[in-house]
From Swiss-Prot:
GO terms for molecular function: 3'-5' exonuclease activity; 5'-3' exonuclease activity; DNA binding; DNA-directed DNA polymerase activity. Residues 318-494 form the 3'-5' exonuclease domain. It holds the Pfam family 5_3_exonuc_N. Its EC number is 2.7.7.7. This is DNA polymerase I. SMART domains: 35EXOc (SM00474), 53EXOc (SM00475), HhH2 (SM00279), POLAc (SM00482). InterPro entries: 3'-5'_exonuclease_dom (IPR002562), 5-3_exonucl_a-hlix_arch_N (IPR020046), 5-3_exonuclease (IPR002421), 5-3_exonuclease_C_sf (IPR036279), DNA-dir_DNA_pol_A_CS (IPR019760), DNA-dir_DNA_pol_A_palm_dom (IPR001098), DNA/RNA_pol_sf (IPR043502), DNA_polI_H3TH (IPR020045). Residues 1-317 form the 5'-3' exonuclease domain. Single-chain monomer with multiple functions. The gene is polA. In addition to polymerase activity, this DNA polymerase exhibits 3'-5' and 5'-3' exonuclease activity.
Length: 897
């Protein structure tokens, strides 16, 4: 079939499942995405995002094909039974979405191609070979290197990989790539190649001898290029090498002919064709974007389409550049420092990182002049360490430093150059963005949302590190000017005045508190953790053997799929709808088989082992301290989060979890730990906001609030017996809990839960009036406000009653959780200010409503009393008193009475 020649645009070949799987696992890093009905949507979200991106770039891909995997056994799997068998089983949550995703692709009008017995890679190879057009393969699979030519390129979504790039990266031609794979193997596909020969020696062999066949034809020459051990492996693994090459070789003839005109990119937005499905699965924001779109392209030839511009923003947001000076001598840097004598100087600054977060440089902008300081080279020449220490100190002393996520930059300057941070002036646009909408804080997404600019930050550019200084400078110039415009946007009306004040008085000073905690670190008992690591490992082995013996078959205990098959199919235990083996479902069949309690015990221990015991030993510094990273803008409610490691999620209620906490200790014998915990902070906020007389009186007189509630609901005689129910109701209300959730929490009938809540509101009508009023206010304003005026935004446009109910519950929760966060921040600021430059008190950690300090043991009672006084009396004038409990100990696990 004769094909037309297209002079512009390309044929896009999509490695469909690879794209979707990657987006699914990215979305599942923190918490898997689900819709309001609990159905998993991470993979579908990736599909929708992919289609949005492709539609935006449709003029560059007039023809598009989605390549699919064969549903039958592939040729490679027939050749090698172990082929890809080392890969983990796909999560059931993901598998549920695949048929839906394929159906959506078909409905949207895309061409999907599957060939029985062949992988999607083979489909792509065949179509790329047949194609008369320039062809772009959308994938990160390195096997496609063998196809690269002047007509075929590989694209990972950001960077194009050409034939010359294959030569540069691997030192071989694309035509030699299967030979290369034959030698080095591929661990992801589970074929081994030649054991012990890596990329360096494989490259030398192929550069010298040309192909795998030539290598084995000229073993005497190959012998001179290898160590004796490698040469012996080459001889022994000949069969493996040729099998590996065969497996790596993509089939270019599984499709003999193809009508490329039939795979034109759909002329209208493909998502319009699945509006009903998007609604069904809860893609509300996508539907809203479709409805609010100022234009819909219909029946427009893609190759001749003209870009349609958005409305011009209020600010002048056209991308601007500044002249950049690469600082390679002391003179221009000294001249820059002289300009800082202006007391109103503002320096816009970006920490320059590579994709692995390694620091490469600093870029900064003063007025309209940009500067690029390569730090890797600058450490040696022409700048001395002392010169840079002085330069950075002057910079932070004289100018207001403005950045987006400044804490890593400031921490770097303090750690590397000992720059004092006590009296610095800063403005962080990430904090301003967080106050405007806590759901969107990333630099690129904030620029897109508020300035309507598409800018890829340098750290997301794959080859940024290898670019020339001139290229880096130009990219950073764009970033710095975008940062400047973003700051102007927030300061000139983009953010309410009271939130700017909140940023200045609370959130910005809080950055310094967090840096102090991070630098201080929390010491661990390293020998204890080494012993615990071995104990956990031994116990895991024993548990695993016990479980397998009880079940009577060997299988991978860490595979939910295999566990489900064993429990539900082999043992015939009662099944749930999804065959899930999560904790909730295993608890339902706890008494059905003696292995179930052991499986739950194994899982808890395995999580502790992999999350804490081993990682903590790896992450400790030379002083055996753990330095976590606190995220100020990571949660919608304003609560702190931490990572690397997450010290806020160390279990407290289980004996094994307490063993982890036991390993955290005071840094020396002169110090001890102090834990100060706010008592019932959300309920005190409920009393403050609702002004309920009975609730306020109970707190003012120091009564047991849960017992008082129980008396009001059940009478004096049953009060103690029913206290736990009253406690669940008290806390449930501030978390937006309804009768259904209460019935699940207490394991009681729904009707009984409803009667408890009705009785509660009848007894405390002012609380009911307050909560109803808050819901009405959230519906009216689409915002839920905290004590200090932060807010969370909810968009009720076009949502159904179910979603609206969820939003209102989240809104009520945001008021109390967010206000509790406000109080904790105020308390941490007050204590930090009181003990500034005083080594007798060091703030280490915040966990929920608790603060962990390290204090001098000789003055421990007095210091405890002073810290509690500040936290109780100086934080905020609520209508009821704030109250804390405190404990002193040498180890973290002992901080509860």
């Amino acid at each position: 079939m004769e094909q037309p020649v297209i002079k512009e645009g390309t044929l896009a070949l999509i490695d469909t499942f690879a794209y979707l799987f990657r987006s699914y696992y990215m979305s599942a890093k923190n918490k898997p995405l689900t819709n309001d009905k609990g159905f998993p949507t991470g993979l579908l979200t990736g599909l929708v995002g992919m289609v949005k991106k492709f539609y935006k770039d449709r003029k560059n891909m007039p023809f598009i094909v989605f390549a699919l995997e064969s549903q039958t056994k592939t040729k490679r799997a027939e050749k090698l039974g172990e082929y890809k068998q080392n890969r983990k089983d796909a999560p059931k949550e993901m598998l549920l979405q695949i048929p839906i995703a394929l159906e959506w692709l078909q409905k949207m009008g895309f061409t999907c191609v599957e060939v029985g017995g062949f992988e999607a890679d083979d489909v792509i190879a065949s179509l790329a070979t047949l194609s008369p057009y320039k062809t772009r393969i959308y994938s990160k699979d390195k096997d496609f290197n063998q196809l690269l030519s002047d007509k075929i390129a590989l694209f990972d979504g950001k960077t194009e990989f050409l034939a010359k790039d294959c030569v540069e990266k691997y030192g071989i031609l694309p035509s030699q790539f299967t030979d290369y794979q034959g030698i080095v193997g591929d661990s992801s596909d589970n074929y081994k190649g030649v054991k012990g020969i890596g990329s360096k020696n494989a490259k030398e062999l192929l550069q010298r001898l040309g192909s795998l066949e030539k290598i084995y034809e000229n073993l005497d020459l190959a012998k001179n290029l290898l160590s004796p051990k490698m040469y012996q492996a080459l001889i022994q693994d000949k069969g493996s090498a040729f099998l590996s090459k065969e497996l790596a070789t993509l089939e270019r003839g599984c499709i003999k002919e193809f009508d490329f005109l039939s795979c034109a990119f759909p002329s209208e937005n493909p998502l319009l064709k699945i509006k009903d499905e998007l609604k069904e699965y809860g893609f509300i924001s996508t539907l809203r974007d479709l409805e609010n779109s100022p234009f819909i392209v219909e029946n427009v030839p893609i190759l001749n389409s003209t870009p349609i511009l958005d409305n011009t923003p209020a600010l002048d947001n056209a991308p601007k550049k500044s002249r950049m000076i690469v600082l390679e001598s002391a003179e221009p840097l000294s001249m820059f420092l002289e300009k800082l004598e202006n007391p109103n100087a503002r320096v816009f600054m970006r920490l320059v990182l590579d994709k692995d977060k390694k620091i490469l440089a600093l870029a900064f902008l003063l007025q309209d002049q940009g500067y690029f300081l390569p730090l890797e080279e600058a450490l040696f020449s022409p700048f001395s360490l002392e010169f840079l220490q002085n330069a950075f100190s002057q910079m932070l002393q004289h100018a207001c430093i403005i950045g987006h996520d400044l804490k890593p930059l400031l921490s770097f300057l303090k750690a590397k150059y000992q720059v004092p941070l006590e009296n610095i002036r800063i403005q962080d646009t990430q904090i301003l963005a967080f106050l405007k909408n806590p759901e969107k804080v990333g630099f690129d997404e904030v620029l897109k949302e508020y300035l309507k600019e598409d800018l890829i930050p340098h750290e997301k550019i794959k080859d940024f590190k290898t670019k020339s200084k001139a290229e880096k400078s130009e990219l950073l110039s764009m970033e710095l000017n975008a940062l400047k415009r973003l700051c102007e946007y927030f300061e000139k009306g983009g953010l309410e005045e009271d939130l700017l004040t909140l940023a200045r008085d609370i959130e910005t000073p809080f950055v310094k508190v967090l840096m102090g905690m991070e630098f201080q670190g929390f010491k661990i008992d390293a020998p204890y953790f080494k012993r615990l690591e071995q104990e956990f490992k031994n116990e895991l082995n024993v548990l695993e053997r016990q479980i397998l013996d009880l079940i009577g078959v060997d299988f991978n205990l860490n595979s939910p799929k295999q566990l489900g098959e064993v429990l539900y199919d082999k043992l015939g235990l009662p099944k749930n709808k999804s065959h899930s083996t999560d904790e909730k479902n295993l608890l339902k069949i706890l008494d059905k088989h003696p292995s179930i309690p052991l499986i739950l015990e194994y899982r808890e221990l395995n999580k502790l082992f992999n999350t804490y015991t081993t990682p903590l030993l790896r992450l400790k510094d030379k002083d055996d301290k753990i330095h976590t990273t606190f995220i100020q803008t990571g949660t919608a409610t304003g609560r702190l989060s931490s990572h690397s490691p997450n010290l806020q999620n160390i279990p407290v209620r289980s004996p094994k979890g307490l063993l982890i906490r036991k390993g955290f200790i005071a840094s020396s014998k002169e110090y001890c730990l102090l834990g100060v915990d706010y008592s019932q902070i959300e309920l005190r906020l409920l009393a403050h906001f609702s002004q309920d007389k009975d609730l306020m009186e109970a707190f003012l007189k120091g009564r047991d609030i849960h017992l008082e509630t129980s008396k009001a609901l059940f009478g004096e005689d049953l009060a103690k017996e029913k206290r736990s129910i009253a406690k669940s109701i008290n806390f449930g209300l501030v978390y937006g809990m309804g009768s259904k959730k209460l019935s699940e929490t207490l394991s009681i009938p729904l009707s009984e839960a409803k009667s408890y809540i009705e009785a509660y509101f009848k007894r405390f009508p002012s609380i009911k009036d307050y909560l109803n009023g808050m819901r009405e206010e959230i519906l009216k304003t689409s915002k839920a406000f905290t004590l200090l005026g932060r807010y969370r935004v909810f968009d009720f446009t076009g949502v159904n009653d179910y979603v609206k109910g969820n939003y209102l519950r989240e809104g009520v929760n945001a008021i109390f959780q967010g206000s509790a966060s406000d109080l904790l921040k105020l308390g941490m600021l007050k204590v930090s200010e009181r003990f500034k430059n005083n080594p007798s008190v060091r703030l280490l950690l915040q966990v929920h409503d608790e603060l962990i300090f390290e204090i001098e043991e000789k003055n421990a009672p007095e210091l405890q009393q002073e810290i509690q006084r500040i936290l109780n009396d100086e934080v905020y004038p609520l209508r009821v008193p704030l109250e804390t409990s405190a404990f002193i100990a040498k180890r973290w696990n002992e901080l509860k009475g």
